[in-house]
């Protein structure tokens, strides 16, 4: 199996940066994507027993399923607990992402892997993609979006952003950056410009 993901672009950024909106725009142009968050939700369900064993029954809802918001508040308040959850789940998340990616590699066209913690978990060492793309939004604007979207308090939104690598650091590590400080129309224009800048598939195949 060819482990190098020659047609994959890792899409990342801070929470509230607009990654999901960007993925929706990509789909309009026919680009496929893999969503790490969706995979993580499934993995959490499959390995809930391990998570409950570590965090205790306080994270359970009345139907004995995990209350994601309660769990989120716990891990975003404690780096050690956040790292423990990541240690439990990430190997399974990584395996699922790479399995899906290998299937998309067979199509020999560009596709995207939406991984919020791409750089935090090892970047191209963990996910050997062709390129990395950061969606940039200033911290203050990202907090504002999170508060509105998730009905979070300022403290809850800030805690989630502070738990991730600073967006400026991600920008320094990325191959490409798209600015999302403006409105949807501006983001769509930036998406179109980025897509047009991608090397042709034939160039990738011959490299």
Curated annotation (Swiss-Prot):
GO terms for cellular component: cytoplasm. It is found in: Cytoplasm. Residues 8-207 form the DPCK domain. InterPro entries: Depp_CoAkinase, P-loop_NTPase. The keyword Metal-binding does not apply. Its main location: cytoplasm. ATP binds at residues 16-21. It is an enzyme of class 2 (transferase). Pathway: Cofactor biosynthesis; coenzyme A biosynthesis; CoA from (R)-pantothenate: step 5/5. It holds the Pfam family CoaE. It catalyses: 3'-dephospho-CoA + ATP = ADP + CoA + H(+). GO terms for biological process: coenzyme A biosynthetic process. Its EC number is 2.7.1.24. Keywords: ATP-binding, Coenzyme A biosynthesis, Cytoplasm, Kinase, Nucleotide-binding, Transferase. One of its GO terms (molecular function) is ATP binding. Signal peptide: none annotated. Belongs to the CoaE family. Catalyzes the phosphorylation of the 3'-hydroxyl group of dephosphocoenzyme A to form coenzyme A. This is Dephospho-CoA kinase. The gene is coaE.
């Amino acid at each position: 199996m060819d482990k190098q993901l020659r047609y994959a672009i890792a899409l990342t950024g801070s929470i509230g940066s607009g990654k999901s909106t960007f993925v929706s725009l990509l789909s309009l142009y026919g680009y496929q994507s893999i969503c790490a968050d969706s995979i993580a939700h499934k993995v959490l369900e499959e390995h809930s027993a391990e998570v409950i064993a570590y965090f205790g029954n306080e994270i359970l809802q009345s139907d004995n399923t995990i209350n994601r918001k309660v769990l989120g508040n716990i891990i975003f308040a404690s780096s050690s607990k956040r790292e423990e959850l990541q240690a439990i789940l990430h190997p399974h998340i990584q395996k699922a992402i790479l399995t899906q990616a290998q299937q998309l590699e067979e199509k020999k066209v560009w596709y995207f892997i939406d991984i919020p913690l791409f750089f935090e978990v090892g970047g191209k060492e963990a996910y050997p993609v062709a390129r990395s793309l950061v969606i940039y939004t200033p911290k203050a604007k990202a907090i504002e979006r999170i508060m509105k979207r998730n009905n979070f308090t300022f403290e809850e939104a800030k805690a989630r952003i502070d738990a991730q690598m600073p967006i400026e650091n991600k920008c320094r590590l990325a191959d490409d950056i798209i600015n999302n400080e403006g409105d949807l129309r501006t983001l769509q224009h930036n998406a179109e410009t980025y897509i047009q800048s991608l090397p042709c598939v034939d160039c990738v195949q011959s490299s």
